[in-house]
Amino acid sequence: MAITNGYCTLQDVKNALRISDNVDDTLLELAVETASRQIDDHCERVFYQTSGATRYFVPRDSYVCEVDDLVSITSVKTSSAANGTYDVTWATTDYQTEPNNGIAGGISFPVTLLRSVDRYVFPISGGETTVQVIGTYGWSSIPTAIKYATILLSSRLFKRMDSPLGVAGIGDIGVIRVSRIDPDIDALIAPFKKIRMA
């Protein structure tokens, strides 16, 4: 099998596990892809790119619209009648992308928010999608911490076959229970998790 949208390579994991043969390559590739999707789930975002995608959003208010992670924007349109027809095309001078300077918390981030400027406002209509954004979604490159977390998680998933039912024996220490998410992996991906308000 080939890895689809993996955040590390097969060779990265083989190097980490000190594996030089190709006997388990299919299982290792499965571990990489599974680890990558688990990281997506934990972070509530994807780091791979989808080019030329059209997505629709509900603005937070008349001036702010949160969007999926964007590497580049081709067009922004709004539906003035909230009827699914996106009839108002915005110029790049009609909105500001955030985070400012592409940095959030000291980390390079893609665009996650559009703020209206000048004379345009985002139409609000009872929670309906009134904003259409066409562009390249995802991240320009996989963050180093995400790549390393994927290597660790892929290795862990692969080694689970040697660890029955989440319990591992360690020499003189005895038996230890394997936790749900490795604290090191959690610490690596924490800055990239979307924060949700209830």
PLM features: what roles do these ranges have?
Residues 1-198:
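Divalent metal-cofactor coordination and adjacent catalytic microenvironments
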